[in-house]
C-alpha cells in the first residue's frame, strides 16, 4: 500500500467537520509541465483554493545540489520548508493539485517517505470543485496562513522507496532489470517509443532498456482524473492498461517506476500499490537523468 491514504472529497469534508484533536492542513502541490506555460505559484495566490491551504513547491523543496529537476529533498531542505510553511508533526495533511492527480501523488509520497504520520491524497480537486465544496476565492500574499513552526522529520523510508541512477544503471547493464524486475515508464507511448518529442528540447525521446510503457493516464479516470477507489475497480483498470500496452506484471518480482522527471512515475506507483502490488520503488531521476548520464548507447526506441 502507499505511504498515504486516498480520501474522497465527501470524506474530506466530513473529516474537516468532525476532527477535534488534530489540525487538518490542505496542501496544494500543483505543478505544471513547462510546456503548459502556466504558473503554479500565481495560481495558488490568486485562484480559488481549499480553505487554509499551504503551497508545497516540488521544484523548491528538492535536492539543491542536484542538476536534475525536483529530485528528492534532503532532510534539511524538507524540514526547513515544512517549518516555513508552519506544518506541525501532528497535522493531518491532505494533498491535492489543480490538474487532478498529477503532481499531488509526488507530494503525498514525499511527505510519506519523510515519515509524516498522517497524509491523505484528495481524490481529487476536480471532483471537490464539481461537488461545490467550500473554496477560498480571496487573493493571498503568502504560501501559508500559519505561523512558522519547528518541524523535524524523525524517519525516512528512502531506501525502501527510491532507486538511484547507479543502481538503475547496473540493473540495465547486467540485464537484470528485464529479467528480475517489473519496470514501468509512465510517459506517453510516443515518448517511450521515440516517436514524440520530450518537453525539453535537449532531451531525446526513447526509453530505458528493459522498461515497459504504462502511461499514467491509463490508470486514472479519463474524465475526472481520479483513481478508482474500490478494490475491484483498481484491479480492473490496471489489468486493462497492462493489456492495452502489452505489458507483463509478475507480482513476485520487485517493481520500479519511472517517467520524465519523477512526477508522473508516482502516479503509476500509487496505482500499482493500490492494486496490492508489493515492493514498488521510484527511479527518482527518471528519463531526464538517465539520458544525461548514461549516453546514447543506453537509449532504446520502439519496444525491446
UniProtKB/Swiss-Prot annotation:
> Which SUPFAM superfamilies does the entry link to?
Rhodanese/Cell cycle control phosphatase (SSF52821)
* Predominant localisation class: mitochondrion
PANTHER family in the record: SULFURTRANSFERASE (PTHR11364:SF27), THIOSULFATE SULFERTANSFERASE (PTHR11364)
GO annotation, biological process: tRNA wobble position uridine thiolation; tRNA wobble uridine modification
Membrane-spanning residues: none
> Which intervals carry biased composition (Basic and acidic residues)?
191-201
- Region annotated Disordered, chain positions: 191-222
Recorded catalytic activity of this chain's protein: thiosulfate + hydrogen cyanide = thiocyanate + sulfite + 2 H(+)
Sorted keywords for this record are:
Cytoplasm, Mitochondrion, Phosphoprotein, Repeat, Transferase
Superkingdom of the source?
Answer: Eukaryota
Task: Cite the Pfam families for this sequence.
Answer: Rhodanese
Q: What is its EC number?
A: 2.8.1.1
Presence of keyword Flavoprotein: no
Q: What does this protein do?
A: Sulfur transferase that accepts persulfite from NFS1 and transfers it to UBA4 in the pathway for 2-thiolation of the wobble uridine base of tRNAs. Stimulates sulfur transfer by NFS1. Involved in metabolism of sterol esters in a tRNA thiolation pathway-independent manner.
| Annotated ranges, domain Rhodanese | 20-137, 177-299
The misc remark on file is: Present with 5770 molecules/cell in log phase SD medium.
Alphabetical list of InterPro entries matching this protein: Rhodanese-like_dom, Rhodanese-like_dom_sf, Thiosulphate_STrfase_CS, TST/MPST-like
Provide the protein's localization.
Mitochondrion; Cytoplasm
- Tell me which residues bear Phosphoserine: 201, 264
Active site at 259 (cysteine persulfide intermediate)
Can you quote the domain comment? Contains two rhodanese domains with different primary structures but with near identical secondary structure conformations suggesting a common evolutionary origin. Only the C-terminal rhodanese domain contains the catalytic cysteine residue.
Query: By what name is this protein known?
Result: Thiosulfate sulfurtransferase TUM1
Single GO cellular component annotation? cytoplasm
A single Gene Ontology MF term assigned here is: thiosulfate-cyanide sulfurtransferase activity
Amino acid at each position: 500500500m502507499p505511504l498515504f491514504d486516498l480520501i474522497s472529497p465527501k470524506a474530506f469534508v466530513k473529516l474537516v467537520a468532525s476532527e477535534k484533536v488534530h489540525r487538518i492542513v490542505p496542501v496544494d502541490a500543483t505543478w505544471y509541465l513547462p510546456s503548459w506555460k502556466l504558473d503554479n505559484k500565481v495560481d495558488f495566490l490568486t485562484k480559488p483554493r481549499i480553505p487554509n491551504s499551504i503551497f508545497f513547491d516540488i521544484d523548491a523543496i528538492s535536492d539543491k545540489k542536484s542538476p536534475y529537476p525536483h529530485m528528492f529533498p534532503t532532510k534539511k531542505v524538507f524540514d526547513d520548508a515544512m517549518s516555513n510553511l508552519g506544518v506541525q508533526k501532528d497535522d493531518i495533511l491532505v494533498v491535492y493539485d489543480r490538474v487532478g492527480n498529477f503532481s499531488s501523488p509526488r507530494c503525498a509520497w514525499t511527505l510519506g517517505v519523510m515519515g509524516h504520520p498522517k497524509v491523505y491524497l484528495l481524490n481529487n480537486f476536480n471532483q471537490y470543485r464539481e461537488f461545490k465544496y467550500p473554496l477560498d476565492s480571496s487573493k493571498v500574499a503568502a504560501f501559508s496562513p500559519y505561523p512558522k513552526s519547528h518541524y523535524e522529520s524523525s524517519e525516512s523510508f528512502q531506501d525502501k522507496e527510491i532507486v538511484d541512477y547507479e543502481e538503475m544503471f547496473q540493473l540495465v547493464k547486467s540485464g537484470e532489470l528485464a529479467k528480475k524486475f517489473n519496470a514501468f515508464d509512465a510517459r506517453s507511448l510516443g515518448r517511450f517509443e521515440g516517436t514524440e518529442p520530450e518537453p525539453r528540447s535537449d532531451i531525446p525521446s526513447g526509453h530505458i532498456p528493459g522498461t515497459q510503457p504504462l502511461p499514467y493516464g491509463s490508470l486514472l479516470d479519463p474524465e475526472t482524473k481520479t483513481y478508482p477507489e474500490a478494490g475491484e475497480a483498481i484491479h480492473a483498470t490496471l489489468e486493462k492498461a497492462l493489456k492495452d500496452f502489452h505489458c507483463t506484471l509478475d507480482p513476485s518480482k520487485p517493481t520500479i517506476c519511472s517517467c520524465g522527471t519523477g512526477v508522473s512515475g508516482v502516479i503509476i506507483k500509487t496505482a500499482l500499490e493500490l492494486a496490492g502490488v508489493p515492493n514498488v520503488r521510484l527511479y527518482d531521476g527518471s528519463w531526464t537523468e538517465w539520458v544525461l548520464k548514461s549516453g546514447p548507447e543506453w537509449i532504446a526506441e520502439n519496444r525491446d
